[in-house]
């Protein structure tokens, strides 16, 4: 599919009277290609209570996703909530304001006026009696039929029950990448129906694999939500190889509140798989001054985006890590970063930390890269510390030298000044002594 910008639809609750004092606002982003698309609320100012679901590939080859934010119901009439969508591949930016709508149930619905009853009060005419054969008493006239009564008007058509704004919505989620890549785990495709009303709570699911109906799905008990609606989930267990081979899974949902069944289809992203490249990076020298340090795992060049990244040390899982979502690179592949935070003492003790990556394009679907404080890194850190110490000592020496130099210059200048002054004074005194007193000599001659 060629690059296509998304269509954005705001989703609002029925009314301000929601249970629990909170309300859910939604934003549906549909029909875009390729991934990724970013969704924020109020230009990123609103982050609490935001949940953005993973993108889903539709049968049309385009992606769609949704984002939900939970806000206080008291703020719906006073604050503005805007869904900001940014699709960089198509250079599309869309801002949609989510406004509270008045649901159908809050308005007055008038039944159509019943038709006037047809009048059937006049009986049909009595059939004509036969002519008498004699002058005797004629035979009685046949009894006329009873007139049909149409006085009772037909019942007024029943008014439709109020519907929840928008009706039930259906979302289809793929199995977790780790579940599809490990034989010991069970991959599942999940079909979620939300906004199911109390008036029509029954939901029917039908599942199809490559167009063939299957019957091994399990429907979980419905769960009541904070907005007084139900959430119903159906889970279909799939075979590892069926999913990896690109089989298509369809969930068909029926409910009385829907004008027609809703169908959602999902399958593994199509395209040639590309093997990820894995690189591990030690903590930076600047970070070694802190109590905790970060170990980084860069995974790049993989396709499709279904991937799982975990950390472990000495065979035991490490849980204090964060992994970014896969991001689209310029060559059409994906990349991500995973950061593990550990105590600096554990790193300096030489513990080995491993970044484990699972992807369908890898040999045995698995690879691992280890990282530890090697002797080379220890020597480098020691040399860096020694170099820092030498530089500190050198600066101290240079500072002392400059200070002494300036003092010596000042001392030399002062001594020279006094020497010149003394010599000048001596010359003046000597000159006065040598010059003869001609006045005395003239006086003596006279």
UniProtKB/Swiss-Prot annotation:
Residues exposed to the Cytoplasmic side: 419-446
Region feature (Hinge): 99-160
UniProt key word Isomerase: no
GO molecular function: antigen binding; immunoglobulin receptor binding
Gene Ontology CC, one term: plasma membrane
Documented effect of changing residue 269 to A: In variant OMM
Chain residue ranges for the region called CH3: 271-376
Membrane topology, Extracellular segments: 1-397
Metal-binding listed as a keyword: no
TM spans (from-to): 398-418
The entry's keywords: Adaptive immunity, Cell membrane, Disulfide bond, Glycoprotein, Immunity, Immunoglobulin, Immunoglobulin domain, Membrane, Repeat, Secreted, Transmembrane, Transmembrane helix
Residue ranges of the region described as CH1: 1-98
UniProt-reported outcome of changing residue 224 to Q: In variant WIS
Lineage top rank: taxon: Eukaryota
Disulfide topology: 27-83, 191-251, 297-355
One GO-annotated biological process of the protein: complement activation, classical pathway
Oligomer and partners: Immunoglobulins are composed of two identical heavy chains and two identical light chains; disulfide-linked.
Function summary: Constant region of immunoglobulin heavy chains. Immunoglobulins, also known as antibodies, are membrane-bound or secreted glycoproteins produced by B lymphocytes. In the recognition phase of humoral immunity, the membrane-bound immunoglobulins serve as receptors which, upon binding of a specific antigen, trigger the clonal expansion and differentiation of B lymphocytes into immunoglobulins-secreting plasma cells. Secreted immunoglobulins mediate the effector phase of humoral immunity, which results in the elimination of bound antigens.
Protein name, as recorded: Immunoglobulin heavy constant gamma 3
Organism: Homo sapiens
This protein's encoding gene: IGHG3
